[in-house]
C-alpha cells in the first residue's frame, strides 16, 4: 500500500492512499487545482483516482470534492447525513458518482473500507480504516477524543494519520473568540498535542506503527511544538521511538511522508 498526506492542516486536508490496482483520496479540502498539483508532485494523475471518501462536510475537507468529481468523473463516497449536509456546497454531481455508504462499510476494488464514528461538530463525521489484504491505514482527525471504537481500529493499523491540532496554552491565550476556543477544547472539537500523545500511548500495543501527526492549527500550533510535545509524552512512558513506533509530521502546504509498505 501507499499512504501520503497531500495536505494536512486547518486550512485544507487531502490524503492519497493506493494499492497496486486502486487509488483513492480521503477528503479534498482545497481547490481542485491545488489537489491536482499535489498528486502530480508525487507522480500520480488526477484522472486515475478511483474514489473520493469524505469524512465530514466542513470546508477544509470538501472544497475541491465537487470540481474533481465533475472534471474527472470520480465517485464520491460518504454516509447519508454527510451527503445531505454537503450537497449544496459541492455543487451538482452526476447521479452515478453519488455513493452513499451504508452500515459503515464499502468495498472499492481491492480496498475494504470501514468507517467509524468520530466526535466532532458535524452531521455524522467519520474516520476511515482502509484495508488491503493484511495491511491497514487509518485516517483519524477532527476528533475531540478517542472512543473505544476508534482505538480498536487504530490498534490494528500499520499507518495512522492522527490529529495533533493545537497547543492548549496557545489556544487559550490566542486570538480566537471564547466560544470558538470552547468548541475546540470540547469533546466535539479537536485533539491537542498532549491529547495526541496520550492517544498514541493508548494504541501502542507492540505492533509497530507509523504515526503521522496532522491537522495542525495554523494559529494555535506549529510543527516543532507538536512533535516535541508528543515525544515528551511518549518518552515519559518508556516508548522507544523507531522501535515501538515512528512519528512524523504531515506538511500543511505540500505532500509529505510518502509511505510504501
Where are these regions (language model features)?
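Active-site metal-binding motif and surrounding structural segment of the metallo-beta-lactamase
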Residues: 33-79
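Metal-dependent catalytic neighborhoods of phosphoester/phosphodiester hydrolases
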Residues: 63-72, 87-89, 221-228
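Active-site neighborhood of phospho(di)ester-bond hydrolases with catalytic His/Asp-centered motifs
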Residues: 26-29, 50-57, 77-80, 138-141, ...
Amino acid at each position: 500500500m501507499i499512504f501520503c498526506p497531500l495536505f494536512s492542516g486547518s486550512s485544507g486536508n487531502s490524503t492519497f492512499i493506493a494499492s497496486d490496482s486502486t487509488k483513492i483520496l480521503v477528503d479534498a479540502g482545497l481547490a481542485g487545482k491545488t489537489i491536482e498539483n499535489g498528486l502530480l508532485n508525487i507522480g500520480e494523475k488526477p484522472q486515475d483516482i478511483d474514489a473520493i471518501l469524505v469524512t465530514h462536510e466542513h470546508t477544509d475537507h470538501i472544497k475541491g470534492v465537487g470540481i474533481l468529481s465533475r472534471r474527472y468523473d470520480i465517485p464520491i463516497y460518504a454516509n447519508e447525513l454527510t451527503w445531505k449536509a454537503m450537497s449544496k456546497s459541492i455543487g451538482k454531481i452526476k447521479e452515478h458518482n453519488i455513493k452513499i455508504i451504508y452500515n459503515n462499510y464499502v468495498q472499492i476494488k481491492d480496498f475494504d473500507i470501514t468507517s467509524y464514528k468520530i466526535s466532532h461538530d458535524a452531521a455524522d463525521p467519520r474516520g476511515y480504516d482502509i484495508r488491503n489484504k493484511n495491511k491497514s491505514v487509518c485516517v483519524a482527525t477532527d476528533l475531540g477524543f478517542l472512543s473505544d471504537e476508534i482505538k480498536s481500529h487504530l490498534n490494528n493499523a500499520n499507518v495512522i494519520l492522527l490529529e495533533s491540532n493545537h497547543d492548549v496554552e496557545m489556544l487559550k491565550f490566542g486570538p480566537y473568540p471564547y466560544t470558538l476556543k470552547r468548541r475546540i477544547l470540547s469533546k466535539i472539537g479537536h485533539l491537542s498535542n498532549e491529547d495526541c500523545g496520550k492517544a498514541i500511548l493508548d494504541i501502542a500495543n507492540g505492533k509497530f506503527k507509523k504515526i503521522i501527526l496532522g491537522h495542525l492549527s495554523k494559529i494555535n500550533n506549529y510543527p516543532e511544538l507538536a512533535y516535541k510535545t508528543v515525544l515528551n509524552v511518549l518518552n515519559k512512558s518508556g516508548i522507544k521511538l523507531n522501535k515501538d513506533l515512528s512519528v512524523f509530521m504531515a506538511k500543511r502546504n505540500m505532500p509529505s511522508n510518502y509511505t510504501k509498505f
